[in-house]
Swiss-Prot record:
CDD domains assigned to the protein according to its UniProt record, in alphabetical order: AAT_like
Chain coiled-coil ranges: none
Activity over temperature: Optimum temperature is 95-100 degrees Celsius.
Name of this protein: Aromatic-amino-acid aminotransferase 2
Keyword terms: Aminotransferase, Pyridoxal phosphate, Transferase
UniProt EC number: 2.6.1.57
Similarity comment: family membership: Belongs to the class-I pyridoxal-phosphate-dependent aminotransferase family.
A GO molecular function held by the record: pyridoxal phosphate binding
Keyword Ligase tagged: no
Length: 389
């Protein structure tokens, strides 16, 4: 039987391979998983139960229920400065990951190029390939806190370039683009007539008084931007699989068509729960409590990593930290395997996030504070015993 050429070009995530290696090891501490360790707030669960009891278990419109789209529109206007019509410019999806491929499929032609800042979230390049395009990695650097610069973008743009993916706050580096960064990127996109996919799933988890900005809020940028977001990180709802986006009407119309023949619609009763959650002050109190705890954990891990001899930029957002391990003489994969076998700690090799990730590892601090302390102790012990720092 013939296999799809495109699927053959997409490899399984290195992260999953690492988790397979760690399985069965007693006493393992995983700092590899990219999801909140917090449970979904109780009132959101209650809203879902209420929706079930009301029989809201049938198909919804392919675009998502209007009640949720209206709540999302309110959120975009209040928190992001984005004015989107809930009837035609907002869509509900099955998680946010799905939006990358669907969004690219609305405009990307075969062999057109998509610029992706590297290190990058593992789903971006495969989505570009599956949509028929060519991913082009644009390196970001530790010296610039891993923030994307237009100077680097200019080195990689070609007549075939059709789009740019940005992710702020960033997975895996924790970088947050400034308003000035976004203004320069916006000018670059206009100059080269590019579409932008802006992944903002970590938007509420920023630290040290930093503010996160949406590029679609800048003058003239809504018409060329797909603002991707969801409930997984914000409300600790990873298993619920519910996302939302704002985009020009022509993009939404095509993405709805894709969803129609792919997932049909997101889960109906979950949509009703999410609509109420967005308008409930308790939800935002929970977000702020999570943000404060993530910041406390970040401070611990950043301090300990630097103290043990792994130079580390202090991340401004998300819940990841990206220490440099080059001076150990190990590749990022070798370092990660050593930590699993000797320290019983899972960290993800930077190479899993693109070429610019080599020489680093990703650590998630979405783990209990006490476990983070123990993990740092174990890592430091192994590094010193092996004389790697």
């Amino acid at each position: 039987m013939a296999l799809s050429d495109r699927l053959e070009m997409v490899n399984p995530s290195e992260i999953r391979k690492l988790f397979d290696l760690a399985q069965g090891i007693e006493g393992i501490i995983s700092l590899g998983i990219g999801e909140p360790d917090f449970d979904t707030p109780e009132h959101i669960k209650e809203y879902a139960k209420e929706a079930l009891d009301k029989g809201l278990t049938h198909y919804s419109p392919n675009i998502g229920i209007l009640e949720l789209r209206e709540a999302v529109a309110e959120k975009f206007k209040k928190h992001n400065g984005i004015d989107a019509d809930p009837k035609t410019q907002i869509m509900i999806t099955v998680g946010t990951n799905q939006q990358i491929l669907m969004g690219l499929a609305t405009f990307l032609k075969d062999n057109e190029e998509v610029l992706i800042p590297s290190p990058m979230f593992v789903s971006y390049a495969p989505a570009v390939i599956l949509a028929g395009g060519k991913p082009v990695e644009v390196p970001t650097y530790e010296e610039n806190e891993f923030r994307l610069s237009v100077d680097e973008l200019e080195k990689y743009v070609t007549p075939k370039t059709r789009a740019l993916i940005i992710n702020t706050p960033n997975n895996p580096t924790g970088a947050v683009l400034t308003k000035k960064d976004l203004e320069e990127i916006a000018d670059f996109a206009v100059e080269h007539d590019l579409m932008i996919l802006s992944d903002e799933v970590y938007e509420y988890f920023v630290y040290d008084g930093v503010k996160n900005y949406s590029i679609a809020s800048l003058d003239g940028m809504f018409e060329r931007t797909i603002t991707m977001n969801g409930f997984s990180k914000t409300f600790a709802m990873t298993g619920w699989r519910l996302g939302f986006l704002a985009a020009p009407e022509w993009v939404v119309e095509k993405m709805v068509r894709f969803q129609m023949y792919n997932a049909t619609c997101p889960v109906t009763f979950i949509q009703y729960a999410a609509a109420k959650a967005l308008r409930d002050e308790r939800s935002w109190q929970a977000v702020e409590e999570m943000r404060r705890e993530y910041e406390r954990r970040r401070n611990l891990v950043w301090k300990r990593l630097n103290e043990m001899g792994l130079p580390t930029v202090k991340p401004k957002g998300a819940f990841y930290i990206f220490p440099r391990i080059k001076d150990t003489g190990l590749s990022s994969k070798e370092f990660s395997e050593l930590m699993i076998k000797e320290a019983k700690v899972v960290v993800v090799p930077g190479s899993a996030f693109g070429q610019a990730g080599e020489g680093y590892v990703r650590i998630s601090y979405a783990t209990a504070y006490e476990k983070l302390e123990e993990a740092m102790d174990r890592m430091e012990k192994v590094l010193k015993e092996k004389k790697l720092v």
